[in-house]
Swiss-Prot record:
InterPro entries per record: aa-tRNA-synth_I_cd-bd, aa-tRNA-synth_I_codon-bd_sub2, aa-tRNA-synth_I_CS, aa_tRNA-synth_I_cd-bd_sf, Glu-tRNA-ligase_bac/mito, Glu/Gln-tRNA-synth, Glu/Gln-tRNA-synth_Ib_cat-dom, GluQ/Sye
Free-text cofactor note: Binds 1 zinc ion per subunit.
Gene Ontology terms for molecular function: ATP binding; glutamate-tRNA ligase activity; tRNA binding; zinc ion binding
UniProt binding sites for Zn(2+): C99, C101, C126, E128
Function per UniProt: Catalyzes the attachment of glutamate to tRNA(Glu) in a two-step reaction: glutamate is first activated by ATP to form Glu-AMP and then transferred to the acceptor end of tRNA(Glu).
GO biological process: glutamyl-tRNA aminoacylation
Keywords from the named record: Aminoacyl-tRNA synthetase, ATP-binding, Cytoplasm, Ligase, Metal-binding, Nucleotide-binding, Protein biosynthesis, Zinc
SUPFAM superfamilies, per the entry: An anticodon-binding domain of class I aminoacyl-tRNA synthetases, Nucleotidylyl transferase
Name of the featured protein: Glutamate--tRNA ligase
PROSITE patterns for the chain: AA_TRNA_LIGASE_I
Keyword set includes Heme: no
Subcellular compartments: Cytoplasm
Length: 467
């Protein structure tokens, strides 16, 4: 069986968004599932709109998602000699010709055709003139006058297109640059691409591409056109639906695996399963399970999926993603056991890493900031004995596991006659500055002996100064 070779060919005219990221993911997963190859190609022939910054952003987005490529990135702007060679092949074989029709004339004929309810295809004025090359000449592909071009699509099935409705289309502009449809075909042929998975907005391009494959005596790739991604109101996905770029999701605290899980469910399914690891996706992905109806992007569902991935994550694996967010807040955080222990206490309490960074603040604040209302309510003289006694008990322990801490809390409860809740809350405020935090036992264990005792002592001093 021939090795599967897929590609992702973004245009660097902006950020990588949900639709493009899903296309990249489907191609990458299929290549990895089949033991094939995945190629990254930057389609930057639109000189006016393409930017280096956008290309770099797309590459960073893919790297963050963990979508790695086996070849590339190739840049179309550096392949002009290849396109020129293939233009000459089509001219020599009679499948293409020079055209000098002015833009004004073409515009006039187009407007007239539309006004008369006709398809505005080229009328063939230059088709049989055998014109020589010139500065103002474009190159057109000679489309058959009759018959149909059939697309056998793995998702949509068979689709037939009347050749007469396609017309002779431009494949090289007068400035010698190739048009999109032509460059794509040449690239896919020369790079050995044999499987093309893309959005179904490309279906109308496909008959033109099939005709060029045949004119160049090249084997057709397998086409799989995936339904578009829509917003919850069933219109084309945009920012007003809450969709952001991939890098914005990174900066907002989403996990790569969380976003990938949500992306793959926009058009692909495996029974009723909602949550997938990356390994599972590679094992399970197939074209047969791509649906025929549009995927609907739901920000709330993405958030829930992300929370599930955070909950199931190894703290050590989350640390590199959380660290930049903590440093952004000005904390001297490092990727060490202290950070891993802090993360462990927050796995069930955080839907995003940004939320986790906010909730982890008390682990790194020095000095600790206190919520005024919490201080006024709990750091009061009648609770000073609780803090002093607990500090004394904790200082003698060999370790701070929950099992080791329980007798210390029990002793304080017995001595003061207060229930656990009445003890835990003043301790929580003393250690975190807040009334909400992870469980008190795990908080103490994560803070460690030195910080726990220092903060209990600081709280006692604060109470003394306030009286």
């Amino acid at each position: 069986m021939k090795q599967i070779i897929t590609r992702f060919p973004p245009s660097p005219t902006g950020h990588l968004h949900i639709g493009g990221a899903r296309t990249a993911l489907f191609n990458w997963l299929y290549a990895r599932h089949t033991g094939g190859r995945f190629i990254l190609r930057i389609e930057d022939t639109d000189v006016e709109r393409s930017t280096t910054q956008s290309a770099e952003g797309i590459i960073k987005s893919l790297e963050w998602l963990g979508i790695d490529w086996d070849e590339g990135p190739y840049f179309q702007s550096r392949r002009m000699e290849v396109y020129a060679e293939y233009i000459q092949r089509l001219l020599a074989s009679g499948h293409a010709y020079y055209c000098t029709c002015s833009p004004e004339r073409l515009k006039e004929r187009r407007e007239r055709a539309l006004a008369e309810g006709r398809n505005p295809t080229y009328d063939g004025t230059c088709r049989e003139k055998a014109l020589p090359p010139s500065d103002d000449a474009v190159v057109r592909f000679r489309t058959p006058d009759t018959g149909k071009t059939v697309l056998d699509d793995r998702v949509k099935g068979g689709i037939a297109f009347d050749n007469a409705e396609i017309g002779d289309f431009i494949i090289q502009r007068s400035d010698q640059t190739p048009t999109y449809n032509f460059a794509v075909v040449v690239d896919d042929i020369t790079m050995g691409i044999n499987t093309i998975i893309r959005g179904d907005d490309h279906v109308t391009n496909t008959p033109r591409q099939i005709l060029m494959y045949r004119a160049l005596d090249s084997e057709l790739p397998l086409f799989a056109h995936v339904p578009m991604v829509l917003g919850r109101d069933r219109s084309r996905l945009s920012k007003r639906h809450g969709a952001m770029s991939v890098l914005e999701y990174r900066d907002t605290g989403y996990l790569p695996d969380g976003l990938i899980n949500a992306l793959v469910r926009l058009g692909w399914s495996h029974g009723d399963q909602e949550f997938f690891t990356r390994k599972e996706l590679i094992e399970l992905f197939s074209l047969e399970h791509i649906g025929t109806s549009a995927g609907v992007f739901d920000p709330d569902k993405l958030l829930a999926i992300n929370a599930e991935h955070i909950k199931k994550s190894d703290p050590a694996a989350l640390a590199p993603h959380l660290l930049p967010l903590l440093k952004e807040k000005g904390y001297a955080a490092e990727n060490n056991d202290y950070l891993h222990n802090a993360i462990h206490t927050l796995l069930l309490r955080s839907k995003t890493l940004k939320e986790m960074a906010d909730k982890a603040a008390f682990y790194y604040e020095d000095p600790l900031s206190y919520d005024p209302a919490a201080t006024a309510k709990f750091l009061v003289p009648e609770n000073m004995e609780i803090l002093e006694m607990l500090a004394e008990k904790l200082a003698t322990l060999d370790s701070l596991t929950e099992k080791d801490q329980e007798p210390a809390f029990t002793a304080v409860m017995e001595k003061t006659g207060k229930k656990f809740g009445k003890i835990a809350q003043p301790v929580r405020v003393a250690l975190t500055g807040r009334t909400e935090s992870p469980g008190i036992f795990e908080t103490i264990e994560a803070l460690g002996r030195r910080k726990t005792l220092e903060r209990l002592a600081d709280a006692v001093e604060m109470i003394k100064k306030s009286t």
